[in-house]
Amino acid sequence: MLILYFIKIGLYYLNSKAFNMTATPAFIEGWSLDKVLGSGGFGIVELWIHKSGKKLAIKICKREVTQLKEAQRKRWINEVQIMKRLKHPNIVKGLNLPFKHPDDKVDLPLLCMEFCRKGDLRKVLRKVENCCGVGEKEAISVMKDISSAIEYLHSNNITHRDLKPENIVLQDERDIISYKLIDLGYAKELGEDSTSGSLVGTLNYIAPELLWKQTYSCSVDYWSLGILFYELVTGTRPFLPKMQHTMSWMQHIRNKRYDDICAFKSKGKVVFGQDIAGPTNLSKNLRNKLIEWFKVVLQWDPKKRGKQYESGISKVVVFELLHSILSKQIVRVFVASMYKINTYEIDSTTKITDLQYMIEKDIDIPINQQTLTDYFGKILIENQAPLLSQIQNTDLFVFKNESPLIEIIPVPAIPIEIRKMIELPKGLLDFETLQDYCRVTIFFIRQQINLFQLYIFALTIKLDLVIAKLDTFNKNMTNTLTNINNLLSELSIARIKWEGGSINKKELTALEINCKKVAKLVKAANQIKLKFNPLILESSRLSNEVKSIDCIKDMFQIYNKIAKIYELHKDEYSHKNARPTEIAKLIFEFLKVQGVEFHNISEIIKQIAKLESELRTLEMIFDSVIAMKTVYCEELQNITQHLTSNAFDISNKEYLSLSTSTNKATNDLLYNSTEKSNEFDSNQFLNISSMKHKEKLDTENDVIYDNLVIRYTYVSYYDLQSKK
């Protein structure tokens, strides 16, 4: 197989007229030729791998020196020299050749470089999912890296002159993707010669003055950056992207005004635009700021390009302005109760509360009703640390407290391009129009799938939050039951201790009453626990049900079908008219599947809401148990104190007064409560028969009575305390 591979390599060299190159041995000093990475005008790039696993990219001139023009030879040598001299993380490193290559010559040296194994930016832009531009995070990374590289070149008095997606490669270092400039063959030091003696670079990206063969400055790279970054965020170049860069194209674009950052044809006329064309993955904040930057770099006049004027004085702001724009961090917050994503601009000083204030202002959910979580479901609690130091991912979720997830999903706004296809599925469309419609459809469906994925993610987080509350309640209940049982034991011990003593009957009765009240409290707490146990089982069942949700698969299948149609149309039916019938059918199918999936999970949402509501009811009742435990502990202390000092007189002491007042208040409130069935319906608490008359209550066995006593004794006690 290896022999066959090198035969193919040999044929490649022959086909590229490289037959006069020195035959390259398969292995040299532990290095072996793996494959040809690519070929340019007169250069070829090989991948070499060392036996240790290290990789290098080596650029070799395909021709002999005698076959090159002097300008071509100088250009080649210039690139080698520049690449070896420059040191920047976003420019591919020029390295010393670690072995003797037979094609390395003094008058035509090889260029040895680091190997970037993730391909180039053009490969990224060609992906179907990027047909309307890459994601915002990736766009920011590319713009930061490449603008930094160009700024470095300019600081060294060098212009690149050939900025394009093919000349930007991706490197993967420690699972972090960085973007690097390659191919400085057209780069020129401005001190040498600032006239464009020949047309260089790719016409789609080069500055107008190079087309006119005028003198140029580093502002040619500003234009190229603008074209490149506009394509990065929209998927298309800004100015008549489907038109060849001819004299006619130039005549149209040179008429653009300062605010014009794009141009397209509509009904046969060229129309200029002042906005970034949609659809795009950019957030509103970043989009608005980039519009201002595009205005600066896409000026037709090279003398004005890249500059802003203040008090009549011009200043180059290309890199400073872009750095300021990109230095802000964008967080995406999925609002679970509204089924929408809001974006917020933050910086290194923004705290959790600052973001919550922004959310409150934006969607009218008060801070005290917000539960903000990170991507992994961890609740973000107010503190003084910067928000960015507490999150690993800038995708966050906000829930409205005591409010379920939205059950009826808002009807999505169907883009006009999709509506046209649905209305006239058999209408004949030209190639470019159908391509645009396909792009919009792909973006729309990906957007809907992304929203639904976040919705499912929010559903799992919501359930996790409820389960966490269940765990907390269970621990509190267990601890409280232990404390109440301990209190009952203390009362029993006190009763036994004083039973054979000299205390009178009234004193002993007080102890017995206290024991009965605490025993009744234990019984009430155990009843709550019995009601709580099924909630644990229900949460476990719901957790398994949520984990088994697999509703994205059907949506993705439809998306993949549309993506294949888009690719097929682009590659095989270029510039042919076609009908959108199949795409229209798939759009209908997608919307139908989406509706079915929403319906399927709505029942789970209702069950989670019910679980949370039942837990809230038990928490409210158990708060009374905790309060009464505190009351009974204080009563025990009072009894013990009076008995120990032999000054315990039930008829005159504060304890008896408190106990009598408390019981009277309890009975009065209990009697009143029987006339308020809505307020104290048994179904609201422990789901047993409601009672309307005080005389029907069994004070020994009825759990509802126990709970009412607990709740109102708590109220009465604190009413009395507040009057003292």
Where are these regions (language model features)?
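Protein kinase glycine-rich loop
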Residues: 34-41, 45
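Glycine-rich ATP phosphate-binding loop
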Residues: 44-65
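Conserved N-lobe beta3->alphaC-helix segment of eukaryotic protein kinase catalytic domains
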Residues: 60-86
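Short beta-strand micro-motifs within the conserved protein kinase catalytic domain, predominantly
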Residues: 93-107
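Conserved short submotifs of the Hanks-type protein kinase catalytic core
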Residues: 105-120
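Activation segment signature within eukaryotic-like protein kinase domains
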Residues: 142-143
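Conserved catalytic-loop aspartate of Hanks-type protein kinases
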Residues: 221
